[in-house]
């Protein structure tokens, strides 16, 4: 592929340079191959310009960045926004994409919405996939990942591969980092979804306003005019999200208790608990639908309605979509029931931020006739301000609290636990996560419910720079097995 075809009109390039043959794109000098175009991106910890010599030594034919270094031995293309240039180049190098693409953003619920939207489409007969925190799920493969939104090269490579495999519908998570860093530019988004906004990533975003602005890039810049914007209407930031979508000329579909049931949106008029399911009554275009949603927690109602809106907004029949909701399966590690002891259910959930922890505990309160117990911690090298908030939430919403470790990274685990314990009055401290889970399970009695929060689907515990094998699911299974033995 000619270099001019990858860069497009993003920069003025000399004819001889524009005619260079490029055989790949890279942003990591360690994976550069002969013929690659290397993008030198400035990051929060290091500057890609430091690795230009290594990229050239590995065979890079040209470099793209925002400033040319002294003595560069290959052509350097200066662009105003190297991150966006990378995303667009990746889209041109890997051109195939599913015909229908829905992207969802928000603090919580992205993984579930992407999974639910994929499941709805599958049930309606479409070859569907989802990409996000738990990786890539498609008809032909499941590839586990760790980033909510992959880097542009990985994202466009995956889309190109699944499109060539016959996938026509894709739902993916659009994180604030991914949106702010232009990783999603070049994706032909058909519809965008917005779930909610609460405190998260304050180690990255300087203010909540900056955080929201990053989220709203989905509507302001990526979904094309005329595309659908499915927005949960029950939050303080909903009006701003709706205004952003309207200003772009999008078809706004407001969903939830304050949704537009008479028009294109979905209005939730009634919800009731039915065992571990919920009976919903909703309105869409003035018509009433009753749905038995096989998921616990009202936050899952919000996720299901955003998913339904994305499916309807991309052309699926409303009646068939609402019927499909009755067959949804929760995403791995999202308020997932993983066992029981003495009749007390045990749940694993990814909740690792204040609002998500509160919602998970509130969702499980109806199932705890006696005691609701929670085991959780907080990640190291991340927003430290949320730790006392989460401690207070746990103390207010649970009857028993055990504070443990959750990816301490380079921080001292004891210090992280202490920050949570400062506000979690009456909580116990068991640093070893497996031991904490085992202790909580051993004490369960009839009428209790246990929430193990923070890791969800994860299969590792990050200590220092090492990722040690660890799974909440496996820890629960081991604890239950030890009681049987």
Swiss-Prot record:
Compartments, record wording = Cytoplasm
For the modification N6-carboxylysine, which residues carry it? 215
PTM: Carboxylation is probably crucial for Mg(2+) binding and, consequently, for the gamma-phosphate positioning of ATP.
Names of required cofactors: Mg(2+)
What NCBIfam families does its record include?
Answer: murE, PRK00139.1-2, PRK00139.1-4
Biological function: Catalyzes the addition of meso-diaminopimelic acid to the nucleotide precursor UDP-N-acetylmuramoyl-L-alanyl-D-glutamate (UMAG) in the biosynthesis of bacterial cell-wall peptidoglycan.
Q: What's the protein called, per UniProt?
A: UDP-N-acetylmuramoyl-L-alanyl-D-glutamate--2,6-diaminopimelate ligase
Q: Which organism is it from?
A: Bradyrhizobium diazoefficiens (strain JCM 10833 / BCRC 13528 / IAM 13628 / NBRC 14792 / USDA 110)
Taxonomic lineage is: Bacteria, Pseudomonadati, Pseudomonadota, Alphaproteobacteria, Hyphomicrobiales
State which gene encodes it: murE
